[in-house]
Amino acid sequence: MSCILNIETSTSVCSVAASQDGQTIFVKEDLKGPSHAVSLGVFVDEALSFIDSHAIPLDAVAVSCGPGSYTGLRIGVSMAKGICYGRNIPLIGIPTLEVLSVPVLLYHDLPENALLCPMIDARRMEVYAAVYDRRLQ
């Protein structure tokens, strides 16, 4: 049984989730905006307390690695690195735009030649964007 702590801070949403064998067992989100420095520590503490209280060994930490808010990314990656260093577990970097494409692939029947173009607001009338095929290539 594998348990992964998931951290998302690349957008205006700050979220921490824990999953065990692909099933979500803990979720905390702040949808109000850029307060990651305040929310993340509390959310991670609650998630680790939940995991430890259920005697579930934490196997890895996954963190969004951008693109996205530079400050948000630094906060999330720093927290993830600290947890991994302290517990001697692997750190998994997850491309933010790739993750945004996954629900579309899972829940929609797309033609073989479909292209996906996830976007995140980069502010100042710009966006972070990528183009993926159905294999996320």
What does each of the following model-derived ranges do?
Residues 49-58, 85-94, 109-112:
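Phosphate-handling active-site elements
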Residues 1-65:
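N-terminal beta-alpha supersecondary unit
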Residues 62-96:
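DPxDG-like acidic metal-binding loop motif
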